[in-house]
Structure formats: structure tokens, C-alpha cells
Design a protein with these regions (language model features):
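A short, compositionally biased
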Residues: 29-32, 210
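Active-site/ligand-binding neighborhood in enzyme catalytic cores
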Residues: 36-174, 178-185
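Short acidic-hydrophobic surface loop/beta-edge motif
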Residues: 1, 34-38, 215-217
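A short acidic, glycine-rich active-site loop
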Residues: 4-8, 134-138, 199-202
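Mid-domain catalytic core of redox enzymes
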Residues: 161-238
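Glycine-rich FAD cofactor-binding loop and adjacent beta-loop-alpha segment at the N-terminus
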Residues: 1-24, 34
């Protein structure tokens, strides 16, 4: 069984949520790890003490904090570039943020909000687990379909139905809407921009292509953002 959803791993710090979701699916414990390839050099990621050792030879949290302080450039922090260089410096921005973010969002970092860079705070330890959460796992059979099949058991499902044709405000006290939010409100403030992805699947004649489930390619001259090797999502890859 192959986890076919890419590097999207169920994770939470909430014990109540974890216990609830485990009613519908058996999870296998999994720790997601990511590496960065920048112009052929491999770095630990998210940025942690090993990353800073690879960059500058920092071997202690104190050394790393001092070096980061030296690299910081005064800036408004109003966009992704300004925030990263003001917090972490120009070198870290170029290696880990610029190319990857501009490929992903299809616009210059000066036009990307600073909040994008704040999602993965720098770590002054050697923890390289991508998700710094208490619970993290992958469905044992490789897919999430059974969760939704069990969640929907006994619940009316309407297909080929326009949500706007329903008197949806009276359906429930709380409602989860997963469609385009701009369409729901009849494009009152105009259409929103949506980011899309292009997937290319390749089968390689090797039992180990890159040695990790996810490799991010952060150089702007590489036309893709990452390579995912699905075998590493298994607790016992073969």
C-alpha cells in the first residue's frame, strides 16, 4: 500500500482529536523528515542546529544565536523577503526561501506575505522532524478514504448539487465549507487567486533514489519545488 497523497501527514498536538480520528482508521507512527538541495548541496530542514553547523560551523545554540544576530539586516518585515533577512539574514533567505517560495507562489518574495516564512520557526536544537507535534501518523493501509467512508456512514450525501441552491444558513449551527469561498459569496470582492501544482510521476529502476521521503529543491534554476519518494512513508521501506 502506497501513501498517495504526497508529503501530507496527519499530525496534531490535541489528544482529543487524535483519539477521535483513530476511531475511523488505524495509524502507523511516522516522523516526516525533509532535506533541502540547493545547487547540489544538501541541508537539514527545517532549519535547526545541524543546518547552522552545515552553513557556518555553529556547534552550540549560543554560537548559532550569535551568528544569526550578526547576519540580521534591518528591515520592515512587511513581506517574506524583508522578514527573513531581518530575522535570519540574506544567506538563509537565498538558500531556503527565495527560489522555493517564488516557484511555489509564482511571484517575487517581495509580494509574498511574511506569514509564509513564520510557519516553520528556526530551531536551536537538532530536532529535524518536520512536524513538531505530539501525534503524527499515516493510515496503515496508505489512504484516508476509509476515514471519510466511516465518517459519512448514516449521513445523507447529495451529489451534483449546487451548494448555493440550498438554504445553507439553516442547515446547522456550525458548517464546514470546503469549496471556493469567493464563489460562495458570489464574488462580492472579486475572484481570489488560487495556487495550483503540477505533478509528474516517474518509476525508477532503483530501490533507493534519494534516501528520504521529501527533498526540496530551493534553487530558482531548478524548475520543480520538490521530489517525493513514496517508499519512505512506510515504517519499513522495501
Amino acid at each position: 500500500n502506497v501513501h498517495m497523497y504526497g508529503p501530507h501527514i496527519f499530525n496534531t498536538n490535541n489528544t482529543k482529536i487524535w483519539n477521535y480520528i483513530n476511531q475511523f482508521c488505524e495509524f502507523e507512527q511516522y516522523v516526516h523528515r525533509v532535506k533541502v538541495n540547493f545547487k547540489g548541496k544538501i541541508y537539514s530542514f527545517p532549519i535547526n542546529l545541524l543546518t547552522l553547523y552545515q552553513l557556518w560551523g555553529c556547534s552550540t545554540p549560543e554560537d548559532a544565536r550569535q551568528k544569526i544576530t550578526e547576519k540580521q539586516i534591518s528591515s520592515s518585515g512587511s513581506n517574506l523577503k524583508d522578514w527573513v533577512v531581518s530575522e535570519l539574514g540574506e544567506e538563509i533567505f537565498e538558500i531556503f526561501y527565495k527560489g522555493y517560495s517564488e516557484k511555489q507562489w509564482m511571484r517575487p518574495c517581495e509580494q509574498i506575505p511574511a506569514s509564509i516564512g513564520k510557519r516553520l520557526p528556526i530551531r536551536y536544537d537538532y530536532n529535524d522532524a518536520y512536524h513538531d507535534t505530539k501525534y503524527c501518523g499515516i493510515p496503515k493501509d496508505g489512504n484516508y478514504t476509509q476515514i471519510f467512508e466511516k465518517l459519512l456512514d448514516g449521513i445523507e450525501v447529495q451529489l451534483e448539487t449546487d451548494f448555493k441552491d440550498l438554504d445553507w444558513k439553516k442547515l446547522a449551527k456550525k458548517l464546514v465549507y470546503c469549496g471556493p469561498i469567493d464563489e460562495l459569496f458570489n464574488y462580492k470582492h472579486g475572484p481570489l487567486e488560487y495556487r495550483s501544482l503540477s505533478f509528474k510521476t516517474e518509476i525508477k529502476d532503483t530501490d533507493n533514489f534519494q534516501g528520504v521521503s521529501q527533498m526540496n529543491f530551493t534553487s530558482v534554476d531548478v524548475p520543480w519545488t520538490r521530489i517525493v519518494e513514496h517508499k519512505w512513508f512506510s515504517p519499513k521501506p522495501t
